[in-house]
Structures are given as structure tokens and as C-alpha cells.
A protein has these predicted regions:
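Acyl-donor binding region in acyl/amide transferases
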Residues: 47-177, 182-192
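Long, contiguous binding/interaction regions
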Residues: 201, 207-208
């Protein structure tokens, strides 16, 4: 889906998580009120900037052609990060409120992003999590995506008891879909699931808070 973007810096050697999409993105920050230290971040790739960048980051991991009809109003979220001392809920709530305002200001309707599950166990937890979620949170077929490098789910244990990672749980509570089977991101040793959240599907309990 467009030109390949090369990494601008090697995270393993620079200590920085940087790639070629960063320059095309808007960056949402939460700062601590006294020290002004950055304690929470999201990066946002808007539709017109995705076109300039040669496509969405997610297209490097998935065939997202079934989402093409959404692209004029679809933003991609990435690099969600909250400082370890501020992971009590307030910071992510502020980030989500900022995202909601961004979406409403620019009249965008859909958010997508790759939600990552660590694979230190070889992928069994990720396979079990997908198996657990697919019956209740899988997207309609018209929003389905297909991994270029699929996690080999059938070769893994799909029946382990798992706890859903907090960020994925938060997206699902808002009303997000899982758009298909996980991709294996060998560079970061994670299993990535493509998440889609239409603003129109946000749970009414949260819509009153975020969509004012």
C-alpha cells in the first residue's frame, strides 16, 4: 500500500523508539503539571498524512484492503505509552479524551491501530487471547484484515487462562473490534492484533464522558 518507509533510527542502538512514520504524525502528549515531564503519548496518523507517507503502518503487517472505503475518515493510532509511575488510569483517560477531541475537531469517524501482546512464551498467551476474544469481539466480515506473517495459532496452545492486557481491554470496553487473527512482528517479538474503533460504536457509558 504505497512506498516502503525505512526506519529513521535503530531502537536497539539509539535507545529511541523512532520510525519513518513519526514525521508524518501528530503527537498527543500528557505532561505532569508541575515538572512538565511527558508522562503519556500517542501518535496519530491522519488520512491525508497516511497518503503522503505511502500508507498506514498497519498495512506493513496486514492486508487492510477491506478498510479502504473507510480511509477518508480513518486515523491510525500508535506508540501508546504511559510512564510507569502514572499507570493508575488518569493518564490514559486524558489521552483518550484528547483523541476524542481530535477526532471530533477533524470530523474523523474510525480509529485503527496494532495492539501488541508480548511473546516471551513463544506466542501461547497471544494465541489463547485471540481464541478467547474472537467469539465476542471479532469484527464483521467487511472489516476483516489478514496478517502478512500470521501467528501460527494452530501450532500453539489456545486454551491457556489469560488476562487481557490493559490497553486492549480498554479498547474493547469502548466498543472496538478485533479485525482478525494476529500478525507476528518478529522485530519486536510481539503478536499484533488490528483493532478498529468506530466512534459510532463507542459504548454509551463512555461516549457521554469522551464525546462531549
Amino acid at each position: 500500500m504505497g512506498a516502503q518507509i525505512n526506519s529513521a533510527a535503530n531502537p536497539k542502538t539509539s535507545g529511541l523508539d523512532v520510525d519513518g512514520f513519526d514525521a508524518f504524525c501528530d503527537h498527543l502528549l500528557v505532561r505532569e503539571s508541575t515538572s512538565h515531564q511527558v508522562i503519556g503519548t500517542y501518535r496519530i496518523l491522519s488520512p491525508h498524512k497516511a497518503f503522503e507517507a505511502g500508507g498506514y503502518y498497519s498495512a506493513g503487517e496486514f492486508d487492510i484492503s477491506r478498510l479502504a472505503h473507510l480511509s477518508s475518515s480513518m486515523v491510525e493510532l500508535g506508540r501508546a505509552c504511559v510512564h510507569q509511575d502514572y499507570r493508575h488510569g488518569g493518564t490514559i483517560t486524558m489521552l483518550w479524551a484528547g483523541l476524542a477531541k481530535y477526532m471530533q475537531t477533524h470530523n474523523y469517524e474510525y480509529m485503527i491501530g496494532c495492539a501488541s501482546v508480548p511473546m516471551q512464551d513463544g506466542g501461547h498467551m497471544a494465541a489463547s487471547l485471540y481464541h478467547q476474544l474472537k467469539d465476542t469481539h471479532l469484527s464483521p466480515a467487511e472489516y476483516r484484515v489478514f496478517p502478512h506473517n500470521p501467528l501460527p495459532i494452530d501450532a500453539l496452545n489456545k486454551d491457556l487462562p489469560v488476562i487481557c492486557p490493559p490497553l486492549i481491554k480498554g479498547y474493547l470496553r469502548l466498543g472496538a473490534y478485533i479485525c482478525g487473527a494476529p500478525a507476528w512482528d518478529a522485530a519486536f517479538n510481539t503478536a499484533d492484533m488490528l483493532v478498529l474503533l468506530p466512534l459510532s460504536k463507542i459504548n454509551s457509558r463512555y461516549a457521554a464522558h469522551f464525546l462531549k
